[in-house]
Amino acid sequence: DSDLSMRTLSTPSPALIFPPNSPGFQNGRGSSTSSSSVTGETVAMVHSPPPTRLTHPLIRLASKHQKEQANIDRLPPTNQLCRCARVCRRWYNLAWDPRLWRTIRLTGETINVDRALKVLTRRLCQDTPNVCLMLETVIVSGCRRLTDRGLYTIAQCCPELRRLEVSGCYNISNEAVFDVVSLCPNLEHLDVSGCSKVTCISLTREASIKLSPLHGKQISIRYLDMTDCFVLEDEGLHTIAAHCTQLTHLYLRRCVRITDEGLRYLMIYCTSIKELSVSDCRFVSDFGMREIAKLESRLRYLSIAHCGRITDVGIRYIAKYCSKLRYLNARGCEGITDHGVEYLAKNCTKLKSLDIGKCPLVSDTGLEFLALNCFNLKRLSLKSCESITGQGLQIVAANCFDLQMLNVQDCDVSVDALRFVKRHCKRCIIEHTNPAFF
């Protein structure tokens, strides 16, 4: 009984991070941890601090000066810190210094991540009861067993959290996300991509009541990735925009229910957006581009790939008002022609990356406008552009010397044209489907 009571107060086993058949638990290594496999699940025990013993004579602890010079980015990851804590009592105390735990990173589909987070945060809260004041980043992407319980643990224990990534954790819901953004006021980076139950980002009702009518500005999120949150609708986007007014990076890839109306809400509240993706949002049209154009010179990155309702009209809105655009992905927007490329090239002369693949109405004429205006172009994708020939490529290569990537797969271009590009753009990597060109 006494042994069991000691275990509940101590070090998380590395088995919380890795199942028994992982490399760290093969060939007898890691045998000091208590773990067992039951019906394919890892059952991790929590151990007491190891007894004090002499460290290995070849192991030297860093001096105070060396510690001050250490690069925080080189700290061991979560699983290695847990293993270090098993070496001896001194290493145990060093490994659990809260200053080493600015980041928790857990990976794996089978890991019991809810339990792992509970044990880790409980240990890190011992010096500052109930809160982990040093923890700023939690990354549990791909941990499919994460549930609302795990997010509640983070919300309750990590008030200084700045970055949370739960990509692919499809069991979490709006309520748990609301708790995190309400109890972690410094949260700036949130990745809930692939979390299909998440349809909104908002403060909890209790938190909203305590704040002023402008409580939406209390959410400090700047980076929000909701890729593949395919249940998100315009009303949800309206709520997100009203609460997250400081957004600078927003990714809505494959949020297929979003329409131009949702983008109108977004532009009312979020006027600082620099990067925006609405790729594969098939209901977004030229009217949506008119709304996005209200970002004007602040917009640097835009992805509208496979938005089939966007034509030259929408491109003209962007080109006219967003003159500092650096990246545009318009792949699969089959309504774009040489006229749209002309508007873009003449107004967005600082363009560095352009993808107009699968735009069959873009020809060598459009490439000529690019070549004569966008000298800083570094990446150009023309994949499956049926109207492109070697002549257009040669014009681009003769003017855009800094070109680093060119995709002409499934284009009817000659070997001579590809060799011309290679001669003029020395650093260019050419992706092609011409077997005669090496």
Predicted features, each with a name:
Residues 104-106, 133-141, 162-167, 190-193, ...:
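Conserved hydrophobic beta-strand positions in leucine-rich repeat
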Residues 69-81, 98-99:
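The Skp1-binding helix-loop-helix core of N-terminal F-box domains in SCF E3 ubiquitin ligase adaptors
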Residues 81-98:
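Short helix-loop-helix/strand-helix junction enriched in hydrophobic and basic residues
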Residues 118-123, 151-157, 177-184, 200-217, ...:
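A structural signal for leucine-rich repeat
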